[in-house]
Amino acid sequence: MFAEIISIGDELLTGQKVNTNAGFICSELAGAGIPVQRIIACADNVDAIQEQFRESLERAMLVIVTGGLGPTRDDMTKQSAQQFLNRELVVDRQTYERTLDRYKLLGKKPVSSLCENAMVIGDSVVVQNDEGLAPGMIIACEERFQGHYLVLLPGVPREMKSMMRNSVLPYFSGLCGTVIVHSHIKTTGIGEASLAKIIVEIENTLPDGTSLAYLPHTAGVSLRVSSVGTDRSSVEHDNREITDAIVSAARHFVYATSDISLEELVGSLLLKEGVTIATAESCTGGLIAGRLTDVPGSSGYFEQGFVVYSNASKEKNLGVRRETIETCGAVSEEVAAEMAEGCLQRSGVHMAVSSTGIAGPDGGTELKPAGMVCLGLAIRKEGEGVRTETETFVTRGDRLQNKLRFSEAALRMVWKALRS
């Protein structure tokens, strides 16, 4: 079995949006042992959509379509498929009732398009949408393309991802008689090339049916280990063995083997250890505090945050000495240390983390380039006084990327301290 992907939407052809859905679907299907041979972008036009349906279904056993299932006039995918397959539209009661319940929960009056939203193509397998309203459909196209399937999914990435993982992949895995096991490995503080060097021997000796995907992003690199086969115990054994080997080889950089963020892990460790934290930020502008408080339950460990952008604010609000700023510069480990210590003293917490740097693109020098941040971490332990650590981190990116990476480095510093 191989697949084709059709991404529907004028916005994809005018450059208004980037087709991230196709990349995700390719990655998920590859992990399931289903190769993708073509990705096609198609306009919001019934004739164009139906012609593409015909071409793709003649070639591929599995055609996955995203976009065009919404309630607006330019959402033409469902109508195009219904006409193309010459089938009736029927109301899916489960979708209708789920949508009605959501309106009631939000205190909204049901709209006239509620019933239209719940219409699905006859004889299709309905894919429930846990993240939105429009249902998806898995359609066996036996009349014209025997053994071939057309899958319709919403174009909203969050909705599409949930439906792919929870419904579409399990359906076709069961159909093919295959077992698929995925493991996720989260790393921080290491780039893709460096990580590849550490695990090259493992990657070169992967067992048959097991693949490794590198998933780099702005803040770091994630890995996905995928194992495919017909015997569940063997598949699970191979997946676990490779995952354990990678975690062992890259243990200084691996922080999780689940789909968890660094801030979530740090939050759980803070709660577990009964440690409170505060932040003192300059170049990150509150991003570290924002990420910490993005986690539900963060009131159990987060006390407060200072955003001290100017030198005067650092002096006034955190007690950073002017002499230190004039001698060492605002972007220095010495200033980062005093920021963290001042934050610790004023907040009464167990731990305070600070950032001072140059987010760019301007403001850098040869000695202190744009993309450089100095971090401080002040830790108070009963009977031991205050211990302060500092480090300097340099990255290359645009302003927003640099700020995100600075915040990642700060959270990584906190994680390492809690781990030790």
Curated annotation (Swiss-Prot):
HAMAP family: CinA_B
S-S bonds: none
Stretch forming the signal peptide: none
Annotated source species: Chlorobium phaeobacteroides (strain BS1)
The name this protein goes by in its record: CinA-like protein
Pfam families xref list: CinA, CinA_KH, MoCF_biosynth
Family: Belongs to the CinA family.
